Amino acid sequence: MKRIPEPFRIKMVESIKMTNLEDREQALTQAGLNPFLLRSEDVYIDLLTDSGTGAMSDVQWAGLMMGDESYAGSRNYFNLCESVEHFFGYKLTVPVHQGRGAEQILFPCLIERMRQVRGGTEPIFISNYHFDTTAGHIEMNGGKALNVVTEKAFDTESYYDWKGDFDLDKLRDTIATYGANNIAAIITTVTCNSSGGQPVSMANMRAVYEIAQKHDIPVVIDSARYCENAYFIKQREPGYEDSSMLEIIREMFQYGDMLTLSAKKDPMVNIGGLCCVRDHEELFRAVQTRCVPMEGFVTYGGMAGRDMEALARGMHEGADEDFLHYRVCQVAYLGERLREAGIPIQYPTGGHAVFVDAAKMLPHIPAHQFPAQSLCNALYLEAGIRAVEIGSLLLGREPETGEQKVSPMELMRLTIPRRVYTNDHMDYIADALIAIKDQAASLKGLTFDYEPPVLRHFTAKFNSL
């Protein structure tokens, strides 16, 4: 993969400090062998997430100075609504503090509508692949989260353009099994984080929406990385090579009735999110009603005016094709370095991260001992790099039985923040993992020292076996 130079100049820098092995061992022990609990100053390169960790532009920083912090009716809210309608075509917007804020005000409304309007009794949400907080909010509201991603996503070694697609036959079968009246919503996650940041094709989004309309099931687009998904459609899907990013994004969101958005990803702000409804006034009012006590007044939703302005501007920057080309190529460059060294990854690489196949790299560690978490710890000890587990630890336990779920993939996610690290950092990361490959057989599994009941991977503590 050819190295693409950064399409920006650096105006401000933040110093980072390398620690020695002894310091890292002490820090990881104090964190209970959980990189989430490390202090940021103990991390050299932070690949935990791309959420809120990107660098804002000079245009966004200028927007911060134009913040209108009025409690109600902030002009920044109306600027944000203009950006939402420009890109998504949705007219009804509720700002929230981040993506999970959108989930907590929307999902109960969808469950209530399922019960009162469609006569359902057992709320089911179907997705190509729910992410952790999405599934968590569903389960905390008494629902069940089911995944029907294409089986091709689980073959990490084989190239396939659309490893984020729904398996349409499984989608139809799941609706038939549980009854359409019990399906609170179908959630189209773009890109599909848990399958490796993999894109969903336009044809698949269209087909999912047609199935949903046939059964009168609402479709939510979980749109944290909608720009990256649109870029892959332009690059890979016949008929879209000459379309603009705006045209592709506008069509994508025709195949949904509402959206949740963590603005901390593609729009490149440090905090914020959206819950938007295309044209359903009654649902919009219900969401607004929940927003006020849980997030804040309906024209700020937990966001400062200055952050709404930065978000309104960042939506335009995140959809810039030159930037997206650089971003996707930077991720692919790291992935190719690892593949050339014989390190198994989800192939092809997605838009925001390289996903290392820990099950293949550490075949001696079973799923219930969390091989990807063990690999994350080894990477931190080797080079001060913080990554994150996407596997059985994240998947959690069956709500009814408490039995450990077994993830179809055990992945370590190397998440690349936007406009933060250079390609030299990518080389450093690759060199560290290549060094670990030679000692992989010596790595050990983990068991719980403390296991929280919900979203356990964030605050759990472990012992090494």
UniProtKB/Swiss-Prot annotation:
Documented EC number(s): 4.1.99.1
Top-rank EC class of the record's enzyme: lyase
InterPro entries, sorted: ArAA_b-elim_lyase/Thr_aldolase (IPR001597), Beta-eliminating_lyase (IPR011166), PyrdxlP-dep_Trfase (IPR015424), PyrdxlP-dep_Trfase_major (IPR015421), PyrdxlP-dep_Trfase_small (IPR015422), TNase (IPR013440)
GO molecular function: tryptophanase activity
Signal sequence bounds: none
Pathway in which the depicted protein is active: Amino-acid degradation; L-tryptophan degradation via pyruvate pathway; indole and pyruvate from L-tryptophan: step 1/1
Keywords: Lyase, Pyridoxal phosphate, Tryptophan catabolism
Domain of life: Bacteria
Family to which the UniProt record says this protein belongs: Belongs to the beta-eliminating lyase family.
Listed name of the protein: Tryptophanase
Upper taxonomic lineage: Bacteria, Pseudomonadati, Pseudomonadota, Gammaproteobacteria, Alteromonadales
Gene that specifies this protein: tnaA
